Design a protein with these regions (language model features):
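NAD(P)H-binding glycine-rich loop region in Rossmannoid oxidoreductase-like domains
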Residues: 65-108, 112, 132
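Conserved glycine-rich Rossmann-like NAD(P)H-binding loop of the short-chain dehydrogenase/reductase
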Residues: 45-55
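Amphipathic terminal alpha-helices
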Residues: 2-13, 301-302, 310-320
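Conserved Rossmann-fold NAD(P)-dependent oxidoreductase catalytic core, especially the SDR/UDP-sugar
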Residues: 107-154
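Active-site Tyr-X1-5-Lys
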Residues: 150-178
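N-terminal Rossmann NAD(P)H-binding glycine-rich loop of SDR-like oxidoreductase domains
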Residues: 12-42
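Mid/C-terminal beta-alpha module of Rossmann-like enzyme folds, strongest
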Residues: 222-281, 297, 317-319
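NAD(P)-dependent short-chain dehydrogenase/reductase
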Residues: 168-214, 218
């Protein structure tokens, strides 16, 4: 009778590591992508794809510095065959991109997910895509139309990606597909529009307007992604912070000096500043300083078990 050898401690750890599921993360070298990879590598083998360098990644994260649309990237994905995929949509990529490139990258990824038989696809979209409006409902659910692209080409591109993934629900029912739409994400490591806006010492505002705002901490968003990766989760989910507050109160808590300006002055000033590359804020985004876009996060709480753990005060302190 052949004796069985009991695995040693290091061998058991090695076997457990080999058994870990592999997750592909796109736009992994963006500021939010870096935070996400540092969280996911504790539980998954992470394959990070981004054309930007990612030199400070965890040692066990595999990084391919290549465009996902290139054959080399597609060959790598087919070889590694990740069972889980996290796609940071254009709203979180932080690079200005042409609409064609944004849509082509997403279409390529969806094809790879289908070809490799990935079990799970999580796409990070944005609640901003609903669009601020003086006539919108107080708290929009996931069934509300995405109307934010009427004033901004960048938002329109992000909506196109969101809609493309929604159609994938029906095209590939074997893949558990999740779309997360977080409110404005802020954090100490982020270089997105909301975080940079809150870091200003002097903040321009629209005279006569004080919209309600919803913020969520970067770590809470990462928690939501981790929950969405669990088996059996699929659908569209708004991701919200613990509460909402007027813009004036948020800026006061940040000790920022507000500079109220009428719209006919602030709009042209932003156009000139953008032309001189002094800001990335587009005049079409002034609507966020005028009207509210509040969303309901009840579905994420009920179906994902998501609850934001960082208070609004902590979120503002951690904005950097």
């Amino acid at each position: 009778m052949m004796a069985t050898r009991k695995s040693s401690g290091p061998e058991r750890r090695s076997n457990a590591r080999l058994a870990r599921p592999r997750v592909l993360v796109t736009a992994a070298a963006s500021s939010l992508g870096r935070v996400l990879c540092r969280r996911l590598h504790r539980s998954y083998d992470v394959l990070a794809i981004d054309t930007r360098p990612f030199s400070d990644r965890p040692k066990d994260v595999e990084h391919a510095e290549v465009d996902l649309r290139r054959k080399a990237a597609q060959t790598l994905v087919k070889k590694r065959r990740p069972s889980l995929v996290v796609h940071l949509g254009p709203w979180h990529d932080e690079r200005p991109a042409r609409a064609a490139a944004t849509l082509e990258t997403t279409a390529t990824l969806l094809q790879l997910v289908e070809e490799t038989g990935a079990q799970k696809l999580v796409v990070l979209s944005a609640a901003s895509l609903y669009g601020p409006s003086p006539t919108s409902a107080s708290f929009l659910t996931e069934d509300a139309p995405l109307l934010g692209g009427q004033r901004s080409r960048a938002v329109a591109d992000a909506i196109a990606v969101d809609m493309m993934v929604q159609s994938f629900f029906w095209k590939a029912p074997a893949t558990e597909t999740v779309i997360l739409r977080p409110v404005h994400v802020v954090g100490p490591h982020l270089q997105n529009l909301a975080s940079r806006f809150l870091r200003q010492r002097r903040v321009p505002t629209l005279l006569g307007f004080d919209p309600m705002m919803q913020l969520v901490h970067q770590d809470d968003v990462v928690d939501a992604v981790a929950l969405a990766l669990e088996p059996g989760r699929r659908g569209v989910f708004n991701i919200v912070g613990p509460t909402q507050a007027p813009l004036s109160r948020i800026l006061e808590a940040r000790h920022a000096q507000t500079v109220p300006l009428p719209g006919f002055l602030l709009g042209p000033a932003l156009v000139r500043a953008r032309a001189l590359r002094l800001t990335r804020l587009d005049d079409s985004e002034l609507v966020h300083l005028k009207y509210s876009c509040l969303v309901d996060g009840g579905r994420a709480g009920a179906e994902l078990g998501f609850v934001a753990r960082r208070t609004l005060q902590q979120t503002l302190l951690d904005a950097g």
